[in-house]
Amino acid sequence: MAVVWMQQNFQQLIEQLKGTLGKLGARKLIALGLVGAALMGAILYTSIYLGRPSYETLYVGLSRDDVNRMGLALGEAGIPFDVKSDGSSILVPIGKAENARMYLAEKGLPTSNNAGYELFDNMGSLGLTSFMQEITRVRALEGEIARTIQAIRGVKAARVHIVLAEKGSFRRGDQKPSASVVIRAEGGFSAESAQSIRQLVAAAVPSLDASSVTVLDTNGHLLASAGEGANGAALMTASLEQQVASHVDDSIRKALAPYLGLGHFQTSVQAALDTDRRQTKETTYDPESRVERSVRVVRESGDSRNNRNDNATGVEQNIPQEQIQNRNGESSTEKTDRREELTNYEVNSKTVSTVSDGYSIKRLSIAVVIDQARLLQTAGTTPPPANFVDQQITKIRDLVATAAGLNTNRGDVINVTAVNFLDPAGADMEPVSAPWTDTLLRQSGSYANALAILAAVGLLIWFGLRPLLRDQNVKPAGTEVAIREAGEVATPNFIGGAESVGEGVQAVIGGPAAYADQMKTSLSDLRQRMRMPAKLRLEQMIEMDEERVAAVLKQWIHETASGREADPAKASAMPELKAA
């Protein structure tokens, strides 16, 4: 029943709205549509205009000198501007950014002190000496290198100074070039970046060694100095040790987190690395795999005789053609035979050369601190078993040793301790709420949008719906019947078809509830009767109650004759009679 009643009310509302719009006429409908469109446009424009910020960014990442020069230029042009708290961004009112950029570009802003090869664009070739050209070339090279350095993450600004070797006919020794770099670093700058800057500058300048480049920051801290090649290696070693320690620490945390939970343990890892370069050459021979390459055989044989005469020298030896017999002497005979054989073999050999340019872990030192309260919670019983903590520490030590890859032969050390952790600082502190004024200022745009929308809706109701409601609430003429006290004329019951005055009066006197019920049940009949021609409606009224119609006509004639104005509440009882 409730759904049917809602449908009937909705249909009645639609019919009433159609009837009301039909009574307004074409001019009023057009005016109402224009007012609604204007209000919707005003709401949309107000929402967009108040929702965007009052200032927009013009340039970001500017140096202080550029900000000062651009501020002076905008002030001369009469363009309002604002500078952010970091001092590197300029804001202008919305809609003036394009004009401001064009004006600043005309003034050559923003510009930088690091001018590059564009120095040659503004320089004439006539009247320049070789010295001036060389100075300009060095300045341009310094500016280009500084621009490249500023592109590195963590470098806000850079300044480069280069000293090139001077060539001369009367110089005996060769002068080596050198360079210095001053940077303004931010949070993301590291020591490895300083070494990268040295390599960059050395590669950009001919005959410049990286060891001759000095890098420092604006705070006066020396990041890399000339002639410190060993220092660079030490920095690389320290960075490598830090990376290895971080990797081992992550492995330990991944192993302990599922068991103890994050926040219930702390780890510390120290790694000592050996980064010495090693070169090993090893040659291996295989005697089992010999091959006969050549054979050499030498044979020698000999026969020798030796006679010795012991006769004394005299006349007989000096007589010619005289055979002298050896009477006394010694004789010997020697015979030799030698054989030499030489065989050459080819033996397989293997030569291995090993160059180690990496690193090796000399020692690891690991410390693990565990929350004892959390460790006792894992027991599952209260109180925990005896020696429970010691057993758990032993298990955790083995787990950490496996996760970190400890080797006791190289002297690795591990220490696991269970203690009671303190409550984190500020855990019981309540968050400080921001003042309501700050919240109001941050939400001022939203509040302005809401007020604008409410104002637009109010205007729409005042200028659009209010006239419609006023026309709807106007009672149609003839809904009430003027009752004369003397004639005892009651309100006619034209809807229900009452036959006597008493029944009509009783319907009205029955109270608001009875009257509302009667109006609901007869509303459809009344609409049908109102659509009928006036002549037919008048005939039906006369047929229903002739005496009442006659009484009303007599009252009108009497009022017209006396010149007295009729009461609207009484004169509007029978609109059908007036329409007729």
Swiss-Prot record:
- Mark out the compositionally biased spans (Basic and acidic residues): 274-308, 332-341
| BP terms from Gene Ontology | bacterial-type flagellum-dependent cell motility
Q: Look up and give the membrane topology term.
A: Multi-pass membrane protein
What main location does UniProt list? membrane
Which InterPro entries is this protein grouped with?
Answer: AMP-bd_C_sf, Flag_M-ring_C, FlgMring_FliF, FliF_N_dom, YscJ/FliF
Q: Where is this region: Disordered?
A: 273-341
Domain of life, source organism? Bacteria
Q: Which GO terms describe its molecular function?
A: cytoskeletal motor activity
Which N-terminal residues, if any, form the signal peptide? none
Q: Which residues cross the membrane?
A: 29-49, 445-465
One Pfam family per UniProt: YscJ_FliF_C
Q: Which family does it belong to?
A: Belongs to the FliF family.
| Name under which the protein is recorded | Flagellar M-ring protein FliF
Species for this entry: Brucella suis biovar 1 (strain 1330)
